[in-house]
Swiss-Prot record:
It comes from Ruegeria pomeroyi (strain ATCC 700808 / DSM 15171 / DSS-3). The keyword Nucleotide-binding does not apply. The keyword rRNA processing applies. Binds ribosomal protein uS19. PANTHER family: RIBOSOME MATURATION FACTOR RIMM. The PRC barrel domain binds ribosomal protein uS19. This is Ribosome maturation factor RimM. One of its GO terms (biological process) is ribosomal small subunit biogenesis. HAMAP family: Ribosome_mat_RimM.
Length: 167
């Protein structure tokens, strides 16, 4: 498991004074500010953040060292990370998305179905996007106790009982 967890991303600039549009991936979106300073994926660049206001789909924020609209524009797409040990501990039945990505998915009979490509949420519940050599296109598996009875992070595997006809 990675020591860095992605907690947000820069969606672009906001205004003309160097603010950015910040999208938070935290369960409580405002909590992203508690993890300041954030880093880039390599952990080398550090960005102190201050949220300035809520906006549609996120926040306007000041990132340390960003003073102009052009500098803010250049950061569009930047994913922002914090150290895993700064995040709250999760109950046994909850997982950080980053820990699920890359896990192999097996059915209850032990047949490999594929690997988790991403975790998505379209409003109702999380969905695991499963891809693999035997699949024509990725499959979205509901991330529920019924469809995914076992997640074993130590063995890097998921046991799934997918709805009939999904695979």
């Amino acid at each position: 498991m990675s020591d860095l967890i992605c907690v947000g991303s820069v969606a672009g600039s906001f205004g003309v004074r160097g603010e950015v549009r910040l999208k938070s991936f935290c369960a409580v979106p405002e909590d992203i500010e508690m993890y300041s300073p954030l880093t880039d994926e390599s952990g080398t660049a550090r960005y102190p953040i201050v949220l300035t206001r809520a906006i549609k789909n996120g926040f306007a924020a000041h990132l340390g060292g960003v003073e102009t609209k052009e500098e803010a524009d250049a950061l569009k797409g930047l994913r922002l990370y914090t150290q895993r040990d700064r995040l709250p501990s999760l109950p046994d039945d909850e997982f950080y998305h980053t820990d699920l990505i890359g896990l192999e998915v097996f059915d209850t009979g032990g047949t490999l179905l594929g690997k988790v490509i991403s975790v998505q949420n379209h409003g109702a519940a999380d969905l695991l996007e499963i891809g693999g050599a035997g699949l024509k296109s990725p499959v979205l598996l509901p991330f529920t106790q019924a469809a995914v009875p076992t997640v074993d992070l130590e063995q890097r595997r998921i046991v799934a009982d997918p709805p009939e006809g999904l695979f």
